[in-house]
Amino acid sequence: MSHFAKVARVPGDPILGLLDAYRNDPRADKLDLGVGVYKDAQGLTPILRSVKLAEQRLVEQETTKSYVGGHGDALFAARLAELALGAASPLLLEQRADATQTPGGTGALRLAGDFIAHCLPGRGIWLSDPTWPIHETLFAAAGLKVSHYPYVSADNRLDVEAMLAGLERIPQGDVVLLHACCHNPTGFDLSHDDWRRVLDVVRRRELLPLIDFAYQGFGDGLEEDAWAVRLFAGELPEVLVTSSCSKNFGLYRDRVGALIVCAQNAEKLTDLRSQLAFLARNLWSTPPAHGAEVVAAILGDSELKGLWQEEVEGMRSRIASLRIGLVEALAPHGLAERFAHVGAQRGMFSYTGLSPQQVARLRDEHAVYLVSSGRANVAGLDARRLDRLAQAIAQVCAD
């Protein structure tokens, strides 16, 4: 008898599978625009100098490897909440908001999903179409009914009117996931006026906003990218925010994130945090300490924080210049207007508008690897190879 005889193989993650194919490709001029990590001009995902310095200090000063507790590192939680909500936020001053440390932004999303399923039974969750694919499977695994609202039109443009109409149809009291900035996978972000209109619908429909804040600093700046989060937290009595330190601190493998909860009052926040600690205990017990201590050290030291802010701005500006550079490289091929949206998008990703067939040709004929949806990781571009990439895109678009 085999207990596992009927256990079937499931398909691998398509993005990780793309990485495997890229690694096995022998062509010297191959280009990886699939996996969502920041790369510098040398094609490396660097450790930030601020992180290195913080780690050196921690090694010299740390005195224990004991557990950090269900809510994680308290200094990290407080400082990350300040980064997201603002140090002068009334929610923090009145103890109506706090953060629970999680293993990355993905852990924060799963904790939010379990919280909704456990504490708000019957509530569905609504995601943008398209969204990060893991949103779908993660919330389904938590037992939530997953539905979608429109976000991008058939001609690959942000469709705010369709989005608002979709939000109006969401059942009262359901949860709506919103991307704070640097929308993944499209790169299309809402304007301030758009956000105010979304807020109006969320408030009237009494929806619970869950704001995914994975890319703070990669859009228009650390403070600018927090605008929508702070708007919703300031205008609504209850908000959930998931935060990630993978991108803006470069702590991908250290798994550093948090679920920030904004409540009506301090007493209710205590109730909510007791539930989060209970749920976290059954997910990961306590989160890893090292990365959180690094972030807390950086945000708590003016010198390290200043260096980190410079490094984040350097990554942000490089991504923005690569976007503009690609559009300019496409101009001689008569494609600048067709791909003008690439320059206007924000963050690491771009919904290029390329079809799955064109993406396949880029991979097979030109060793350029994109996700089949046409999503490209702009942060994986090499400024020295923009002309080659533009020529490859022109060829697959011409036929």
Swiss-Prot record:
Names of the cofactor(s): pyridoxal 5'-phosphate
In this chain, where does the modification N6-(pyridoxal phosphate)lysine occur?
A: 247
What reaction is this protein's catalytic activity?
A: an aromatic L-alpha-amino acid + 2-oxoglutarate = an aromatic oxo-acid + L-glutamate
Question: Which residues are listed for substrate binding in this entry?
Answer: 36, 67, 132, 184, 375
GO MF: identical protein binding; L-aspartate:2-oxoglutarate aminotransferase activity; L-tyrosine-2-oxoglutarate transaminase activity; pyridoxal phosphate binding
Main localization of the protein?
cytoplasm
Q: Name one GO biological process term.
A: L-phenylalanine biosynthetic process from chorismate via phenylpyruvate
Q: Where in the cell is it found?
A: Cytoplasm
Identify the SUPFAM superfamilies for this entry: PLP-dependent transferases
Keywords in UniProt for this one?
Answer: Amino-acid biosynthesis, Aminotransferase, Aromatic amino acid biosynthesis, Cytoplasm, Pyridoxal phosphate, Transferase
Tell me a GO cellular component. Answer: cytosol
Assigned EC number: 2.6.1.57
EC top class, in one word?
transferase
Q: Which family does it belong to?
A: Belongs to the class-I pyridoxal-phosphate-dependent aminotransferase family.
What does the record note on quaternary structure? Homodimer.
User: Which NCBIfam families does the record associate with it?
Assistant: PRK09257.1
Task: List the protein's name.
Answer: Aromatic-amino-acid aminotransferase
Query: What gene does the UniProt entry assign to this protein?
Result: phhC
